[in-house]
Swiss-Prot record:
This is Uncharacterized protein in bfr 3'region. It comes from Azotobacter vinelandii. The lineage of its organism: Bacteria, Pseudomonadati, Pseudomonadota, Gammaproteobacteria, Pseudomonadales.
Amino acid sequence: MAPPRTSTS
């Protein structure tokens, strides 16, 4: 399971 990605605009 991959780590949560922080979405940067």
